[in-house]
Amino acid sequence: CQGLFGDLTCSLKLLPIIGTGHLFGGFITLSLFSFIFLKAANFKFLHYIDIKKYRGLAFICLVVLFFQIFLGAWTSTNYASLACPDFPTCQGTYLPEMDFESGFNLKQEIGPNYLFGLLENPARVAIHYSHRITALILTALMLILIGCLWFTNAAPLASTLGLVLLLQISLGIMNVVYVLPLYIAIAHNLIAAMLL
């Protein structure tokens, strides 16, 4: 399936929905392999962690995290990563001009070359800003989960999750502040995968 997405990404000239599906599929594949590894490795410390009462909250965090990764992929494939060139504001304001209808049109035309994106700036801002707002929501949810886990025998897991979350937020901010250096963008993707 990933091979097909790779082929379509090139043959359809970087059509954003295909590129997003390809990147998102890679994250899902990595997550499944990681899950299989953790199950097969049978780490003993995982048997002693009592987090059953927080599974619901963890599941909500996971769903929002998958949505956030989709938004990150959509931001990347629509070349919207630099639509908000400042931080914490976006184009000097907290409520910039945004066009959600165009920004989240999943049925973009097949045929044109999407290299560097075809969307107008307000559409790109809507995409980028959605990624930022969802990051705030996800951070709040994960901090609640970390706080809950901190007072169980899963405190080491909570502190690790907190450090990875802090690193991910820092990389996201650095992407904007330092105008998207490739090594920071790659690290942002790798840490997103680690959060899964």
Residue ranges and their predicted role:
Residues 1-196:
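Polytopic transmembrane helical bundles with strong interfacial aromatic enrichment
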